[in-house]
Amino acid sequence: MLKQTIKKWNQSIERYESGNVGEALTILTSIEQSTSKINYNIGVMYIKSNNFRNAIEYFNRSVEQDKYLASSYYMRAIAHHMNGELNHAIVDYDETISKLRGHEYIDYKQLGLDHKLLLAEVLFNKALALGRAGSSVALQATQCFSQPSDSQEFKNQCKKIQDGSQLNFSTRPIPLSLLFKPPKVSDAPQKQRSATTSSIQSSSPSTPMSSSPPSYILKGPSSPPSSSSPSSSSPSLSSSSSPKLPPTPKPSFGSSPPPSSSSSSSSSSSSSSSSISPLTNKTLPPKPPPLPSKKLPSRPISCVIQDVKITLKVFYKDRRLIQIPVPCNLSTFIQKIELKFEITISDKFSLSFQLDGEENEINSQVQLDKMICMEINEINVKDIIPSPSPSPSPSPDKTNNSTSSYSSSSSSSSSSSSSSSSSSYDNKPKSSFIPKTTTRPILPPTTTTTTSTSNNFNRNATLPKKFGSTPSSPSFSSPSSSSSGGGGGPPIPTRGSPSISLLKQQNQTQSINIPPKVPTSSRPKMTQSHSPPSSSPLSSYSTSFQSVSSPSLSSSYNGSTSSYGGFSSSRPPPTPYPYQVLYTDSNEKYYLNTETNETFWELP
């Protein structure tokens, strides 16, 4: 029965090597008592035919018959991998690694398969099955001492798997052209036995002459030594007709036949046993390796190299422990502290550690790496108390060239007021030309003779009507009867305001003549003249009206500063001596010469 099995096994291998995979499968599957090696060969043939389901079934049978056959686990993993069942493939790769038992390869040449199963190739296929998660497994494959024959290409492929740049490499199975071959011990014992029997038969014809001494047999019976027998020279012995008997051999040369035959047989048996014993030793299979003390777990993802972790003590309101991997990035470190203390690390917290009595803040990856390298395991988390922000300092007053800026602002305001007065009759005021002032100065007292201007401002003042428009409820009054010079002009509309009372007191104390105005219908065109006013009211009006400005038209409360002509200043420029600024009831500015009591619309 065993002979028929081996014969069919050899026939199937011959058919497979010639390319007839179907015939080889038919012959192997017809064997009734199949072994794990035969089932392995059938599984490889089914992989060759791309029938992965049947291949997995026969590899299962092979594993059931020999649970230590790592090649069957490996090829079953290849079948699962090529069939798209990556999870099962990863499990079988792990089983293959466990069957290697810490070795980097298994040489199956003694069992009839001329191949070495390498741990590096098993890890390579597992990294392919894991995809992007197999970078660490590919790194382990490159660190193995036993590498495939194409080691350089193998390392390049492993490096690409680590980088994740390419994951479509083909698997590395045991070559499908290699199969387990049957042992060649069926005819060897018979040949050895025939050789031993022929050697024994060749030595059998010399057995009858074994009773005579060896020296006599070699020399022959016709030439006995003359010196050996001292009685050969006597005539009585020579003349006798009785045959001569051979002399008795010496004890040193003689040997009895039974011991010689037994010794020869024993020597032949010892030689035959010595010649057979090497063959019997070669045919015996090697002893199986010892079983592992602890069964390794079988799971889809298992790594030989584990991540190194360190434990840190974090002090905030109490002490708590965290574990971080090595190496560790700053975001992972902060996230673990946040999860442990249930806080959010932001600008309100600071992380620090003590080194040589100095406190170093952990605000970058460099500081974190420094802490790990120095093996510091205590971290402090502190609240940051925000410092009070300083109050903004007021902007410096632009006092330089205040006189020139005021003159330019007064000229621009005069032009804007003139344009607004000329267009007030058409109900189209040009508000864009009105200077933007922020406060309204109060009329200064009449007793002052200096050129300084008061810094008091009326913050509750309301915006008056635009220049040239008629007030809503005007009241008319004429100048005082005690006024001298100037003559009477057109009536001036007045309304109740703090400046009116001051003006009345001033008119009572001294005689002030307000310069007359011409009717608006005959008002002349404005001229850019800076000459002193003439005697005629018309020329006085035409030369002085261009500098008239109404600061109350666009005045508004804005702290304690005013804007004149686009420049920020705390007070208006001073008026030259002996002139004083006054305002009419309609908020029109004019100038008073305190020495001559003459009034002007513009400074001469």
From Swiss-Prot:
Compositionally biased spans, kind Pro residues: 244-260
Source organism superkingdom: Eukaryota
BP GO terms, sorted: superoxide metabolic process
One Gene Ontology molecular-function label: superoxide-generating NADPH oxidase activator activity
Record-linked CDD domains: WW
Residue span(s) of domain PB1: 309-384
Disordered: region residues: 180-298, 383-581
Biased composition (Polar residues): 502-528
Cellular component GO terms, alphabetical: cytosol
Annotated knockout phenotype: No visible phenotype.
Biased composition (Low complexity): 194-215, 225-243, 261-284, 396-424, 435-453, 467-483, 529-570
TPR repeat spans: 36-69, 71-103
Repeat listed as a keyword: yes
InterPro entries named in the record: NCF2_NOXA1, PB1-like, TPR-like_helical_dom_sf, TPR_rpt, WW_dom, WW_dom_sf
UniProt function note: May function as an activator of NOX1, a superoxide-producing NADPH oxidase.
Other information: Although it only shares low sequence similarity with members of the NCF2/NOXA1 family, it may ensure the same function as NCF2/p67-phox.
Name the record gives this protein: NADPH oxidase activator
